[in-house]
Amino acid sequence: MIREERLLKVILAPHISEKSTVNAEKHNTVVFRVAIDATKAEIKAAVAKLFEVEVESVRTLVSKGKTKRTGGRVGRRSDWKKAYVTLAAGADIDFVGGAE
């Protein structure tokens, strides 16, 4: 069993992009930015508990940080992890819905 404090720290934010919107419409898949050390089991449990939906599968990838320059200095952005969460048929997560 994963502790509730950990589940709250796993999901950082929804990742909204053109690709994630198409995936949501066609494949019932939602994309999240997650903690770099999060496992698929933790992500699945966190989404199921926080959004009260049934999760079918989780796919993850680590996006490498870009090298950026500011003046003469060279720096690097942090690596971050993205999770594609496929929801069960009929399940839906509404991020932009207001009060009804």
Curated annotation (Swiss-Prot):
GO BP, sorted A to Z: translation
Gene source species: Shewanella sp. (strain MR-4)
Quaternary structure and interacting proteins, as annotated: Part of the 50S ribosomal subunit. Contacts protein L29, and trigger factor when it is bound to the ribosome.
Gene: rplW
Domain of life: Bacteria
A single MF term (Gene Ontology): rRNA binding
The protein's role, per its UniProt record: One of the early assembly proteins it binds 23S rRNA. One of the proteins that surrounds the polypeptide exit tunnel on the outside of the ribosome. Forms the main docking site for trigger factor binding to the ribosome.
Alphabetic keyword roster: Ribonucleoprotein, Ribosomal protein, RNA-binding, rRNA-binding
Family the UniProt entry places it in: Belongs to the universal ribosomal protein uL23 family.
UniProt name for this protein: Large ribosomal subunit protein uL23
Any matching Pfam family: Ribosomal_L23
GO annotation, cellular component aspect: ribonucleoprotein complex; ribosome
UniProt keyword RNA-binding, yes or no: yes
